[in-house]
């Protein structure tokens, strides 16, 4: 019996997000608002990996991630890699990192925080622990764990 393989076509131009934590691909599509963008998107889930047991991969045609989207991606899957594709070749490889200060991408869960009540006040968080992903609002000092992070 011959083995049937599912093959995903290479993209001419766009972004490939590789080494995503397994099971995080859908959440990344949602947070980055990619699923309704009108462009072709491929999501591969639980793909075998040499570096990590399993991984997700996202391919987005004709689009490159903004700096703000890359910051959100770092919070969702810090070990992910972003590859910019131009004319079917990798033109640029980006290793993402969680910034020490996270500005304007995460909502503070404290309803009384100044960042939720003052116009023009951007949210700012300090990275407390990169392994368990714990952040702290610099205004109200509220600590937020990974599972409670809400993106703006």
Model segments located where?
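Cys/His-clustered metal-coordination modules, chiefly Zn-binding fingers
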Residues: 88-152
């Amino acid at each position: 019996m011959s083995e049937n393989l599912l093959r995903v076509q290479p993209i001419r131009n766009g972004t490939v997000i590789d080494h995503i934590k397994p099971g995080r691909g859908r959440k990344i599509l949602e947070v980055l608002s990619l699923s309704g963008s009108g462009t072709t998107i491929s999501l591969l889930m639980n793909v075998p990996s040499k570096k990590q047991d399993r991984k997700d991969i996202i391919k987005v045609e004709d689009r490159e991630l903004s700096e703000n989207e890359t910051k959100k991606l770092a919070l969702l899957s810090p070990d992910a890699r972003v590859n910019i594709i131009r004319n079917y070749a990798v033109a640029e490889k980006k290793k993402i990192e969680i910034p020490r200060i996270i500005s304007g991408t995460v909502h503070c869960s404290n309803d009384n925080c100044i960042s939720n009540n003052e116009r023009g006040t951007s949210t700012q968080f300090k990275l407390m622990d990169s392994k368990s992903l714990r952040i702290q609002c610099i205004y109200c000092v509220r600590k937020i764990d990974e599972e409670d992070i809400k993106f703006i």
